[in-house]
Amino acid sequence: MDINGNAFVVGSGSGIGRACALGLAKGGAKGILIADINLEAANRVATECRGATKYMIEIFERIDYCINCAGIGVQLARNISEADFGEFSRFLQIHVEGTFLLVRSVSAAMQLQELRPIDPTNPGRGGARGSIVTLGSGNSFAAAPHLVQYTAAKHAVLGVTKNAALDNAAHGIRVNCVCPTWVETPMIQSARDGGVEIDSWVKGMVPLGRIATAEEVADTVIFFCSPRSSYATGCGFLLDGGTTLTCHV
């Protein structure tokens, strides 16, 4: 998919991040830096983001694609009347603050990079300095019962993405958000362990009748990294197996 630059993947130890790193490698990425930043260490996140970005530039000289897959899943679903404030704050810290700090750091680095033609044979496509992809969720668009911490965090991730896309557009940097619903990852298993009845919900609500694979999400992420999506920025791309095609009453 015309992937020949350098990729910076955060949260690639397992699940979607791992699938993205492997997909980029198979797709021909010149270099890949895998980083697992500790987003729960609030006093160190900004420093770790800057340090990882600086290291990426030192090793590969530029960042062509940045993908943030770091996140946590809900382990205890609760009604809003019983929701735990500490857990709510933790979700905002990891998903929202982590996304903001990483996107801020990478945007600053990309803005200093050389503008390269997207397609030398088609000048009308213009030039690019890089592409950033964040990971939202179906909950970036809609709420789900007893998941206020996750819904709030994923709405905010999409908001950060849209504003970053707007601020970066003049610099030739695209920023998009891939928003899957249920994906077969360790995070989903963690939600199962916490009592969320994912499998029965999927059978009744998803037209395609199954949970997505991590590789299917990675394919979408890589599309938004590639020049084939050169006119797409600020998108929240819903990858839901048709879940939102109908109204479930």
Swiss-Prot record:
Write the record's keywords in alphabetical order, separated by commas: NADP, Oxidoreductase
- One term of GO molecular function: oxidoreductase activity
Q: Which residues form a coiled coil?
A: none
What SUPFAM superfamilies does UniProt report for this protein, alphabetically?
Answer: NAD(P)-binding Rossmann-fold domains
Q: InterPro entries attached here? A: NAD(P)-bd_dom_sf (IPR036291), Sc_DH/Rdtase_CS (IPR020904), SDR_fam (IPR002347)
Its pathway?
Secondary metabolite biosynthesis
Q: Does the keyword Oxidoreductase apply?
A: yes
**Binding positions for NADP(+) per the UniProt entry:** 16, 104, 150, 154, 183, 185
> Record's Gene3D superfamilies?
NAD(P)-binding Rossmann-like Domain
Catalytic residues at: 150 (proton donor), 154 (lowers pka of active site tyr)
EC number(s) per entry: 1.1.1.-
Keyword check for Oxidoreductase, yes or no: yes
The kind of enzyme this is, by top-level EC class, is oxidoreductase
**Similarity comment: family membership:** Belongs to the short-chain dehydrogenases/reductases (SDR) family.
- Function of this protein? Short-chain dehydrogenase; part of the gene cluster that mediates the biosynthesis of virensols and trichoxide, fungal natural products that contain or are derived from a salicylaldehyde core. The pathway begins with the synthesis of the reduced chain in virensol C by the highly reducing polyketide synthase virA via condensation of one acetate and 8 malonate units. VirA has interesting programming rules since the first 2 ketides are fully reduced, the 3 following ketides undergo beta-dehydration, and the last 3 ketides are only reduced to beta-hydroxys to yield the trihydroxy portion.
Q: This protein is called what? A: Short-chain dehydrogenase virB
Q: Which organism is it from?
A: Hypocrea virens (strain Gv29-8 / FGSC 10586) (Gliocladium virens)
What gene name does this entry carry?
virB
